[in-house]
Structures are given as C-alpha cells and as structure tokens.
Amino acid sequence: MSFSRRQFLQASGIALCAGAIPFRANAAGQQQPLPVPPLLESRRGQPLFMTLQRAHWSFTQGTRAPVWGVNGRYLGPTIRVWKGDDVKLIYSNRLAENVSMTVAGLLVPGPLMGGPARMMSPNADWAPVLPIRQSAATLWYHANTPNRTAQQVYNGLAGMWLVEDDISKTLPIPNHYGVDDFPVIIQDKRLDNFGTPEYSEPGSGGFVGDTLLVNGAQSPYVEVSRGWVRLRLLNASNSRRYQLQMSDGRALHVISGDQGFLPAPVSVKQLSLAPGERREILVDMTNGDEVSITCGEAASIVDRIRGFFEPSSILVSTLVLTLRPTGLLPLVTDNLPMRLLPTEVMSGAPVRSRDISLGDDPGINGQLWDVNRIDITAQQGTWERWTVRADMPQSFHIEGVSFLIRNVNGAMPFPEDRGWKDTVWVDGQVELLVYYGQPSWPHFPFYFNSQTLEMADRGSIGQMLVNPAS
C-alpha cells in the first residue's frame, strides 16, 4: 500500500493523540448545539412550499460543503400538520435532475403518495392536496426516485413530518417544538479531509459511513429543562441500524412507533432503530445530570488509522446526542402517563397469507422491480398475514398501510414493537398483520421495498394494487 506524506502525518497524529484525548467530539467545548430544523405548519389553508435545491452546510467546524436540501438548508424543515386538515403541498424541483418525493408513513390514496409516478423534471412542480385522516405520528419525507433514491437521500433530500391530533394535544407529555420536543434525525456519512460528504455505491448491500450525524451535526448537545424531554427519533441512514442507549444506564421511555402512540409507555435500556424507522422517547432529566445517547462501540485507534487509507464502516464516534439540563423549570412536570391510547382490538381475520423473500441479491421473491408489473392485489378494508424473510438483515417498508408485528423468528415482538408500524427490521423472519386502509390504482400503486436504499435502487421493490372498498 502506498500513501502520501500528508496521510502519514495525519495517521501519526491520531496515534500519538488518541490515548490522551477522548475521541468523542472530542471534549464538551468542541461540541456544537443541535441544529433544530425550522417548523413549517399547515394553517388556515395556506400551502406549504418545499423547494428542492442545492445548498451549503457545515459538517465540520470551519468548512462549508455543497449539499442538497429543502428550502435552502441541508435536510429540510419539519412539517407539522393536523388530523382533519387538507394540506396543499407545493414541491418545486430546482435541481438539475429528475426527483420524486414521498412521505413515508402517510396514509393517503396512491395518487397522492408521490414516488416514480409523480416524477418532477428540473424546474417542474408537483402540488398534491393531502387529506390528513390518520392519528398523531412521526413520519418522514424523502426522495423516492428510481435508481437514485440512495444518492438523493444521502445528499440531503429528507426531513421530518409530524401529524398531530386531539389526543396528542391533551396528553401530559412535552409538545413545545425545539424547547422540550426535538427532532433527532440520525445519519451516517463519510467525510473527506475538507468536511465534504463522499458517496460511492457499494458492490453489494448498502452504504455505511464512519461519521455519525444528528440533524447534520457531529455529536451535538442540546440544553433542556429539568423535567421530561421528548425526542422524536428517525433513522435516515441508507442502511445502518442503530442500538441506542443512555450513557448512564437510565431508561428510555418509548411512547410511539412509526404509526403513532403505543397503548402505554415502555421502559427499555436499549432501543433498536432500523433505517426508515421512527420512534418517540421520553427522557427524565429531573435529577439535573448531563447524559448522552450513544449507539455502541466506537472505532479503535487501529480502526481510525486504517480509515485514513481505505473506507471504513466503523463509526469514529458513537455519541448521538448530549442532553444538558439547565436551571429552567420544566414545562411538563407530571409523572409519566400510565396510558396513552386505549388498546385496539383487531376486527376481522386475515383474508389470505403471503410470503415475501428478500435475498442477498436485489429483488423481492426473485423478481426485480418492474414499473409495468403489479405484484400484489388486495382489497381496501381487509387484513392479510405477511411472512417476510431476509437472507441479509435489512429494514423493510410497506407504503400506504399499517401493520402489527405478530412474531419475530417465532417469538413475541418486544413491547416497544407492539404498536402500529410501517417499517420493520428483518433478521430471519417476521410475521406481520397488514391492514389495507387506503386504495391505490394501477398507474399509482403502493410500493413495498427494502429500506436498504441501495438494494431498493437495484430492484428490491414490489408494486401493490389495493382495490377501493365497494
């Protein structure tokens, strides 16, 4: 292996300094505040404008890198809508290539889901009116362009989408955006020496980087009051799954999954977050001690040195976010609510069963995506049992539906996974009870796909026709 004098000096510097300086950010003084995306709300029938364009962003101090984003910033604003509203959304593509967008987890008819059937060429717009009829949930919007989704999401075409309803407004939980209720968008990237993201499609599987980002920042901190803090977690990485825990071992209180609140809070010490998956957690900060969210073991000194000469998939730092309590009085002082939602009882029985196979190679059930082929035909208002198997562990998403996890490799799902979902980690076999609540049409089908974005780009996508209820 040959390498430059500059690379040798950089590697030598790491080897000399790594033992003396913790490689987390590295010290508190070098941490930057958590960037909180601006909030864009639907009110009084006003349209929401979403401009897809080039921008610049600072991933490392003192540098600015070219990125893509929405409304002039890396990633995009947080969208907040209300159940019962009809929201007009105006996408404007000011990029030099075709883009299609979707809101993952949104329950609307097929023609309004976006995706390949709603491709925007450069300088084109798309303006759907979205009927918001689902319960409160944390969703996300992102590029969904055939053969380009992985690159476009990596570039920055993604953001959080919040649905609120009467229940979410009245629950005694934090709900002041940017004060005690924060979006936490987790990604991994590979940055060059100038702080610019690098992307190269892997020969197999999905992209993994060595630098962890939250809302576009490395190892950020956020100042919070001494009370309950609500974190809305989104894994917007191309393929990496995270196992989250608190640095001092305190509990994470899970209150919501992909499609809304759990019946009751679930306290866990470790929490899985698969690509495309969303979870909401509450953290108790009443003791006034600083604490961090982490995600496993960081790279060793040898791994860090090796990373200067070849791409690494091992995270340099596993620090996700530091919570720093202040002397401010909490906005929410109540105890954790015992119940969030009444327990729902499934009405009706599955009308049929399906087997879905995700292999090491691209494709679903041995077939690559074909825009002219409908793979599944179902009926609105019915249930089906899906058994999903994966040879290579990966995340799996179904558009336009909600599902319950019946079992994971023959065992009951964890309590935090027993709410309504649209995305699931598959390592072996999972059995799902899928409910078709929305219709789609042949030219505007729903999609089910690997949430390893590179696998989806290579053809791990199926198309689903849901006939309207008669």
State the predicted function of each range.
Residues M1-F3:
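Secretory targeting signals
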Residues R5-R6, R232:
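Short, cationic motifs built from Arg/Lys/His that form the positively charged side of catalytic pockets
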Residues Q7-A27:
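N-terminal export signals
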Residues N26-A274, I281, N287, V320-D334, ...:
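Histidine-centered copper-binding motifs that mark active-site loops
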Residues V103-G105, P111-P116, M120, V254-P265, ...:
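Active-site pocket scaffolds in enzymes
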Residues L139-H142, G288-A299, W441-T452:
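Short, surface-exposed ligand- or partner-binding patches at beta-edge/loop junctions that are enriched
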Residues D289-V320, A456-G459:
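Terminal connector regions
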